[in-house]
Amino acid sequence: MSDFSHIHPDFQHIMALSAKDRLAFLDEPRWIGYDTARLIMDSLNALMDKPKRPRMPSLLIVGESNNGKTTIIRRFYDLCGKAYVNDDADAIKPVILAEAPPSADEKGLYISLLERFFAPYRASDSTAKLRYQVIHLFRACQVRLLVIDEFHSLLTGTATKQREVMNAIKLLCNELCIPIVGVGTREAVRVLHSDPQHASRFDVVSLPLWALNKDFQKLLASFEKALPLKKASRLHQPELASLFHAISGGNLGDLHRLLVECSKAAIESGEECI
């Protein structure tokens, strides 16, 4: 029997599958944990557990595009935010994960939130009516945390529109007494600076590009444990680590795509290692 000790025990059974199935396995979404991601997850959990009070703390997660921000919040949602029915037969949604409207628009924000409840609404309704519906559903479903992805999109629009949508977010935070988490590129910080009150409510956490160091080598070793290759590639070795860092630029999403494509080539060629 072959020794697949270079693969995580949870994935070793994949090695019994055909090459076609192993190629399909590479395209499946998979969580690769690392220190910064775990710290952000801990911060999200801490926010979710905060007792309700006026002026709830909030968080803005920023980083380069395709560098793992959305993956982290979706992982958090999968672990802590899925809807369920409680003992009283109430539909509970602990976390609402929504996407900011494509431009700064208060009505568009409410519509984006209503979509997450699969609730009927009329886009032609007044902004005030949509706001009321959002607040009612948040209370009825006992929402404890609101996450808004693509937060930097709120920069698109006039200064007046930006103020309106940020004031709407502040109102939701105050009215519902829940933390709000924004996720976006570094430009998202400019959204907060439109008003000192907004900036004071949000802590900012940065998800930087990876430096070429031991942490990057540890990341490569973690990736390798999820690659269904019959031979060890030893991706963490300095020469390979330097090469992958140079090609990916330290961008996590680019690194993941690169490793997947290299693994596919290794399977298809029969080399079975990178």
For every predicted segment, state its role.
Residues 118-140:
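Central P-loop NTPase core of STAND/AAA+ ATPases
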Residues 95-96, 101-122:
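Conserved NTP-binding/hydrolysis module of P-loop NTPases
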Residues 1-16, 33, 66, 212-214, ...:
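C-terminal alpha-helical "lid" subdomain
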Residues 78-89, 119-120:
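Post-Walker A helix-loop "phosphate-sensing" segment adjacent to the P-loop in P-loop NTPases
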Residues 155, 165-235, 239:
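The catalytic "switch" region of P-loop NTPases
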